[in-house]
Amino acid sequence: MAKYNDKELAETSKFLSFVLRHKPEAIGIVLDREGWADIDKLILCAQKAGKRLTRALLDTVVATSDKKRFSYSSDGTCIRAVQGHSTSQVAIAFIEKTPPQFLYHGTASRFLDEIKKQGLIAGERHYVHLSADEATARKVGARHGSPVILTVKAQEMAKRGIPFWQAENGVWLTSTVAVEFLEW
């Protein structure tokens, strides 16, 4: 595996998140319904857009991402973001799963007033993202400011018929979380 510095890996990961989750049209690629993009086309279009992207750099980002944001198809010709999509091109058919008793959501304290009014909503994404442990939720919340960890009564939600899914990187997904299922 080629050697890349942390800044280069982080910038490439952010770029891939942007085009594979939100705006594939920004560089002229098309994702299929499961979010897959042809790797050769991705590299070519990224390079035309002025990004230094190679297969070796992709391999390193996929292999070293602590959150396992991206995955390759079984034949190695396509790549996708595992979850976090906002583009209407993608509708990954996640398998419904029974959640643990509690899941966690990390957010910034400045968002609490709105959450107390409306609960957790997906916003521009397709799903609300939840973590299986508080440490991961804390990292997520810290990206937006002073982190606050909310406990989600996931099993109680599931017992009321609210579905949950789990992405291949372990992130739990649901459509919304009503205020009644949150502990502050």
From Swiss-Prot:
Q: Which residues form the signal peptide?
A: none
InterPro entries found in the cross-reference section:
Ptrans_KptA/Tpt1, RNA_2'-PTrans_C, RNA_2'-PTrans_KptA, RNA_2'-PTrans_N
Q: What does the record give under GO molecular function?
A: NAD+ poly-ADP-ribosyltransferase activity; tRNA 2'-phosphotransferase activity
Q: Name one GO biological process term.
A: tRNA splicing, via endonucleolytic cleavage and ligation
Question: Which keywords, in A-to-Z order, does the entry hold?
Answer: NAD, Transferase
- Superkingdom, natural source: Bacteria
> SUPFAM superfamilies, per this entry?
ADP-ribosylation
Per the UniProt record, one Pfam family is PTS_2-RNA
Q: What is its EC number?
A: 2.7.1.-
Family assignment from sequence similarity: Belongs to the KptA/TPT1 family.
Q: What does this protein do?
A: Removes the 2'-phosphate from RNA via an intermediate in which the phosphate is ADP-ribosylated by NAD followed by a presumed transesterification to release the RNA and generate ADP-ribose 1''-2''-cyclic phosphate (APPR>P). May function as an ADP-ribosylase.
Q: What is this protein called?
A: Probable RNA 2'-phosphotransferase
- The source organism is Escherichia coli O6:K15:H31 (strain 536 / UPEC)
